[in-house]
């Protein structure tokens, strides 16, 4: 690729988006009072990956999420044998579910949002069959009922020949001790990082820009189109085993800056990291981004941060392994001004580089 290319140039510029999100959050806080007659919002979940309210003796959580542009890579490398839309369906569900469960919620119902420019998009039987199968299988993996959805035709908004995929979900937290917020975070907590399965659904616009420059588009497209992990069963297994989860951060947009998502002043010290998969190395080489820019944009091999007391680390890692995932006892919380320090990379992300709340 000629010259350096950044994610903000070809995809999302968070410096212009995040302030508007904060503005909306501020306005939204004025509506919490509308929950009455036995309903009460959990205020500390505003600005988290999922919103929680108390409902009688239980807590409920809700979320809405979108896939982004990963489906455009499936469209680009489609061949006679594969549409790749089973992976696309799976990953859309994964983006929704992995946000929902970060507060301890057990998924209940999930609704689809598939926006198209023209109904012709729906007439591709192979693609639709794969999308529906991937979506269904992912819901089964997450333990969620696919309750329905919306398929709007939006001429003039959606680009012809494409689809905007997203959805919403609701989950239940059966008791207060299973509710996960940042309230329990304390200096000395350990940070467990879970190994990602690759790019997941973030930073795809830059990946697409890289793909366009490569001779072997299919080979790169294949490693981009790996399924994201779904952690719904794992989180419930950890809670069932009475692991004292103090916080969870889903590492998506903003890369490893997301480790400090909690609105608290701690130094997040990361001593060990998983090796980035090949897809990240190709993106870095072709885009010209330096290591700090890559770790500030992508998950770079780790996509979930689970915060637990040191006494629970060994047991938690055993449960993670039994669920088929890999984890690292990666670091710890230290009292101090909010920042993430990646020690082995000599990279520091100051608190101001993640301003979501």
Model-derived regions, located:
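Glycine-/charge-enriched secondary-structure boundary and capping motifs
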Residues: 2-11, 124-142, 158-163, 217-223, ...
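Short, well-ordered alpha-helical scaffold segments within catalytic/effector domains
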Residues: 90-94, 204, 228-232, 280
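Active-site pocket-shaping loop/turn-to-helix segments
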Residues: 82-90, 221-230
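Buried hydrophobic packing segments
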Residues: 24, 52, 96-97, 207-210, ...
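N-terminal amphipathic/basic leader segments beginning at the initiator methionine
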Residues: 2-34, 40
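Gly/Ser/Thr-rich beta-alpha loop segments that engage phosphate groups in nucleotides
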Residues: 49, 70, 150-151, 173, ...
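Glycine-rich phosphate/pyrophosphate-binding loop regions near the starts of catalytic domains
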Residues: 28-197, 348-351
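Acidic, glycine-rich loop-and-beta core segments that form the ion-binding/anion-interacting portion
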Residues: 184-222
């Amino acid at each position: 690729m000629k010259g350096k290319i950044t994610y903000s140039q070809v995809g999302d510029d968070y410096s212009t988006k995040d302030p508007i999100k904060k503005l909306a959050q501020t306005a939204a806080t004025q509506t919490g009072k509308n929950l009455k007659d036995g309903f009460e919002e959990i205020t500390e979940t505003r600005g988290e990956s999922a919103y929680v309210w108390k409902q009688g003796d239980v807590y409920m959580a809700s979320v809405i999420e979108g896939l982004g542009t990963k489906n455009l890579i499936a469209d680009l490398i489609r061949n006679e044998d594969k549409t790749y839309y089973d992976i696309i369906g799976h990953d859309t569900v994964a983006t929704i579910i992995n946000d929902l469960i970060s507060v301890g919620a057990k998924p209940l119902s999930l609704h689809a949002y598939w926006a198209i420019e023209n109904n012709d998009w729906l007439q591709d039987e192979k693609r639709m069959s794969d999308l529906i199968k991937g979506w269904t299988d992912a819901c089964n993996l997450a333990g969620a009922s696919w309750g329905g959805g919306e398929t709007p035709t939006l001429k003039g908004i959606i680009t012809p020949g494409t689809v905007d995929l997203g959805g919403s979900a609701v989950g239940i937290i059966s008791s207060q001790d299973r509710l996960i917020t940042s309230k329990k975070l304390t200096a000395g907590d350990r940070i467990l990082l879970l190994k990602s399965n690759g790019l997941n659904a973030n930073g795809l616009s830059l990946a697409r820009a890289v793909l366009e420059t490569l001779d072997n588009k299919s080979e790169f497209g294949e490693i981009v189109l790996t399924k994201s992990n779904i952690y719904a069963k794992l989180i419930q297994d950890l809670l069932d085993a009475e692991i004292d989860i103090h916080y969870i951060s889903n590492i998506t947009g903003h890369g490893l800056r997301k480790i400090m998502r909690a609105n608290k002043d701690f130094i997040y010290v990361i001593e060990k990291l998983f090796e980035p998969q090949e897809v990240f190395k190709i993106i870095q080489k072709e885009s010209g981004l330096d290591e700090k820019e890559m770790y500030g944009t992508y998950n770079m091999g780790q996509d979930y941060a689970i915060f637990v007391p040191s006494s629970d680390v060994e047991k938690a890692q055993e449960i993670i392994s039994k669920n088929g995932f890999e984890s690292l006892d990666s670091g710890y919380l230290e009292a101090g001004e909010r920042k993430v320090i990646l020690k082995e990379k000599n990279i520091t992300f100051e608190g101001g580089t993640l301003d979501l709340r």
